[in-house]
UniProtKB/Swiss-Prot annotation:
GO terms for molecular function: acetylcholine receptor inhibitor activity; ion channel regulator activity; toxin activity. Expressed by the venom gland. The record marks H28, R43, H51, R66 as: Important residue for inhibition of muscle alpha-1-beta-1-delta-epsilon (CHRNA1-CHRNB1-CHRND-CHRNE) and neuronal alpha-3-beta-2/CHRNA3-CHRNB2 nAChR. Keywords: Acetylcholine receptor inhibiting toxin, Disulfide bond, Ion channel impairing toxin, Neurotoxin, Postsynaptic neurotoxin, Secreted, Signal, Toxin. Its main location: secreted. InterPro entries: Snake_3FTx (IPR003571), Snake_toxin-like_sf (IPR045860), Toxin_cobra-type (IPR054131). This is Short neurotoxin SNTX6. The keyword tRNA-binding does not apply. The record marks M46 as: Key residue for inhibition of muscle alpha-1-beta-1-delta-epsilon (CHRNA1-CHRNB1-CHRND-CHRNE) and important for inhibition of neuronal alpha-3-beta-2/CHRNA3-CHRNB2 nAChR. The record marks T44 as: Key residue for inhibition of muscle alpha-1-beta-1-delta-epsilon (CHRNA1-CHRNB1-CHRND-CHRNE) nAChR. It comes from Ophiophagus hannah.
Amino acid sequence: MKTLLLTFLVVTIVCLDLGYTLICHQLHGLQTCEPAQKFCQKRTTMFSPNHPVLLMGCTYNCPTERYSVCCSTDKCNK
C-alpha cells in the first residue's frame, strides 16, 4: 500500500511539472504566459521625443533593443 501511494505521489509531481508556465510582471499585476512564451521582458521605448513608454510582460523572443531586459524565470522582470 505504501509503495502504491509513493508511486502515485511521484507520478503526480511529474505530471504537475509538465504543465509549468512562466509568470511575468506587467505594469499592473502579473501575467501567466502562454506555453510558447518562454521569456519575460521589460523595455523602454520612445514613441516620441521626451515620452518614454515602459513595456513589460511575456514574450516569444528576447528584444534586441538598447534599453531592454529579457529573462526566463518567474517574476524576473520587475
